[in-house]
A protein has these predicted regions:
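Glycine-rich phosphate-binding loop used to anchor ATP phosphates in small-molecule kinases
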Residues: 89-170
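Hydrophobic anchor at the beta1->P-loop junction of P-loop NTPases
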Residues: 35
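Conserved substrate/cofactor phosphate-moiety recognition/catalytic segment
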Residues: 52-94
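Conserved lysine of the Walker
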Residues: 43
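P-loop (Walker A) phosphate-binding loop of NTP-binding proteins
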Residues: 38
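A glycine- and Lys/Arg-enriched "phosphate-lid" helix/loop adjacent to the NTP-binding pocket
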Residues: 137-211
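NTP-dependent small-molecule kinase module
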Residues: 5-8, 187-249
C-alpha cells in the first residue's frame, strides 16, 4: 500500500491544502517515538548521536529555549522561577511546557514536505521527540498534583488542555525509548552541566519523577518500550534496530 501511495505522491506533490496535509501524512503512516528519561538522564546526548547517524530521521528538541525566553521584570526565566518556587509557578510552567511541546511536534511534522521525504526515504517518516505530551500529563503534572503544587482546579484546567491538544495531534505516539539512569547519577550530571535554573533540583525531586515515569510506562498497552542505560555503540545499534522494527515497509 505504501508503494502505491508513494506513486500517487510523486504524481501529485504540491496539490494538497493545509487542511488536507495532515490526512495525507497519515496515509504515509509516519511513526512518532519519544525519548524518555529523568532530568539529566542523558537524553540529549543520545539524541545528538542518533542525529549524527540517522540523517533520514526527523528530530524534535524539547522546547527549553521557549521556557528560558519567557522572563519576568527581573529577567528571570519561567524555568528558573518554576524551580525556585514550584508552588507558585507549577501550573504556569506545566501549561507552557505542554503547549510548546505540542507546537514543536506539529511544526516538525508540517515542515517535512512530501517531496523532501520521498527524496530521502521510501519508508514511513520517522519523528523522534525528546519527551511527549503524555509525559507532561502522566509524569510531571500528576506528580505536582500529588505533591500539592498544582491544586484540584488547576489540574482540571490542565487536563482539559491536555485532552484537547492530544486529540489534535497529527499522529499518535508509536513507541518509547527510555533512558534509565539512577537519580543520583542524574543529579551529578545536572551539577556538571550547570544549566540555568537547575541548581534548585534535588535527588528527592528526581526520585519522584522516576517513580511517576515507572507508573506511567507500566500502564501502557499499545506502545512499544525499549529501556536503555547509555549511548554506547552497542546501545545505539539496539535503539536503531528498535526504531526500524516500528517502520511500515
Amino acid at each position: 500500500m505504501l508503494a502505491s501511495t508513494m506513486h500517487l505522491v510523486k504524481r501529485k506533490v504540491g496539490v494538497f491544502s493545509r487542511r488536507q496535509l495532515p490526512r495525507f501524512l497519515s496515509s504515509l503512516r509516519p511513526i512518532l517515538i519519544s525519548i524518555e528519561g529523568n532530568v539529566g538522564a542523558g537524553k540529549s546526548t543520545l539524541i545528538e548521536e542518533l542525529k549524527r547517524r540517522n540523517k533520514n530521521w526527523n528530530f524534535i528538541d524539547e522546547p527549553v529555549d521557549v521556557w528560558s525566553s519567557i522572563k519576568n521584570e527581573d529577567e528571570e526565566s519561567l524555568l528558573s522561577v518554576y524551580y525556585k518556587d514550584p508552588k507558585r509557578w507549577s501550573f504556569s510552567f506545566q501549561s507552557c511546557a505542554l503547549l510548546s511541546r505540542f507546537q514543536n511536534i506539529e511544526k516538525a511534522m508540517r515542515s517535512v514536505t512530501i517531496q523532501e521525504h520521498l527524496c530521502k526515504d521510501e519508508h514511513s517518516p520517522v519523528f523522534i521527540t525528546e519527551r511527549c505530551l503524555d509525559t507532561d500529563y502522566h509524569v510531571f503534572a500528576k506528580m505536582l498534583r500529588d505533591k500539592g503544587l498544582i491544586d484540584t482546579l488547576e489540574f482540571g484546567i490542565y487536563r482539559r488542555l491536555y485532552d484537547f491538544l492530544r486529540s489534535s495531534m497529527t499522529i499518535p505516539l508509536t513507541a518509547i525509548i527510555h533512558v534509565d539512569t539512577n537519580p543520583h547519577d542524574c543529579l551529578e550530571r545536572i551539577k556538571l552541566r550547570n544549566r540555568t535554573g537547575e541548581s534548585e533540583l534535588s535527588v528527592v525531586y528526581l526520585q519522584s519523577i522516576e517513580q511517576c515515569q515507572s507508573d506511567w510506562m507500566s500502564s501502557l498497552q499499545d506502545v512499544s518500550i525499549l529501556h536503555t542505560g547509555s549511548s554506547s555503540t552497542a546501545d545505539i545499534s539496539r535503539i536503531e534496530a528498535f526504531v526500524n522494527s516500528q517502520l511500515v515497509p
